[in-house]
Amino acid sequence: MQRYPLAVEQAFPPEPVFLLTAAMQDVVREGTGQALKSYLPPEITVAGKTGTTDEQRDAWFAGFSGDRLAVVWVGYDDNRAARLSGSAAALPIWGDLMAALTPEPLALARPERIEMVSIDPQSGLRGGSSCPGARELPFMQGSAPSDRAPCSGPMDAAVDAVNQAVGETTKRAKTFLERLFGR
């Protein structure tokens, strides 16, 4: 590959790529891919997705780190059911492979138009420190739920207002500095 020059061209806007990658990191952190914790050290962050086709004919895991990408498929080439799931069959193979390759951690820079919003997992509405289990999740600016979860209190709304004001001030300062010094 090193003999053939690669021309890297961005094909998609950074915001949807960030959102999809964040969701795939959650699969590994707390979903069907969480068994990877036993293969990789905690500082190696990865993103991935398990898969199992109808009637368990195929099992797969596709994932990537900061510098590696691999897809593992487990199944029969005559279309017989393997009777295995992606997390049980393909994920361990992927985990062994990545552990042997010692990948770089996946580190994503959050695009400017992505905001982190506290969400109550029970209702899917805006949460806050008053909501047990509330998580910061990424959203395109302006697309986060505006309704508040029943568990969120008046202090959570005040914190949101302060964070929004600080964000607007930071944007204005950045715009001013860009005009002053150029990009």
Indicate where each model-derived feature is located:
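A penicillin-recognizing enzyme superfamily signal
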Residues: 1-138
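Low-complexity, Gly/Ser/Thr/Pro-rich intrinsically disordered linker/tail segments
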Residues: 117-182
